[in-house]
Design a protein with these regions (language model features):
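Structural signature of FAD isoalloxazine-binding scaffolds in flavoprotein oxidoreductases
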Residues: 1-7
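Long, positively charged amphipathic alpha-helical accessory segments at protein N-termini or as interdomain linkers
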Residues: 11-13, 17-39, 50-185
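Conserved active-site carboxylates
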Residues: 47
Length: 185
């Protein structure tokens, strides 16, 4: 299922970072409803993992006072990609509820808009707590590829601004606000 929505959030642009986490939690809730007891985790900032595989990815793009949230969720089994960094999985592969792309998109849109409304009134703190409760890889060693360098460390939490906190080998802390995360070992 591919889904994009254009929004003009009723919050200052400096808080738009939280929409990425809100979108991940909204889709995680809908996938959880389809999968029952299959554990679902979120990977910073907005991927959703199930049974060791990526079931959903979300991207945001902001421009001209609006933000587009693009979401891709795997409903049917996917062809394995030998070059993919993360194995993929799907609702059907995991024995999930039979759902059409349109139904999943409708449910996700309703949940997303409701959560965005809550975020606009309550801020990032409750989003952060919920996201951390479903977070994959707490204290795992990871490498983050940034535009001009790579940093490595143990995932040490999520900042109040959505930044990924890495605890480096020398004991220092690195805050990452953008980058591609790769698990090590």
């Amino acid at each position: 299922m591919y889904f994009s929505i254009l929004l003009r959030p009723a919050i200052d642009k400096r808080y738009w970072f939280g929409l990425s986490f809100v979108a991940a939690l909204a889709m995680r809730a809908e996938l959880a409803a389809c999968l029952g007891n299959v554990p679902l985790q979120v990977k910073w900032p907005n991927d959703i993992l199930a049974d060791g595989g990526k079931i959903c990815g979300i991207l945001l793009e902001a421009r001209n006072g609006a933000v587009v949230i693009g979401t891709g969720a795997n409903i049917t089994p996917v062809v394995p990609l030998t070059l993919a960094k993360h194995p993929a999985t799907s609702l059907q592969s995991l024995g999930g509820e039979q759902v059409t792309p349109e139904d999943l998109a409708d449910r996700y849109a309703a949940g997303l808009l409701s959560r965005i409304s809550t975020y606009e009134t309550q801020g990032f703190a409750p989003v952060r707590l919920e996201w951390l409760s479903h977070c994959a890889h707490i204290d795992s060693m990871m490498r983050v590829s940034l535009p001009d360098m790579q940093v490595e460390g143990h995932f040490d939490g999520l900042g109040a601004d959505g930044a990924l906190h890495l605890r480096r080998a020398d004991g220092s802390r690195q805050e990452v606000t953008t980058g591609d995360v790769e698990l090590m070992g």
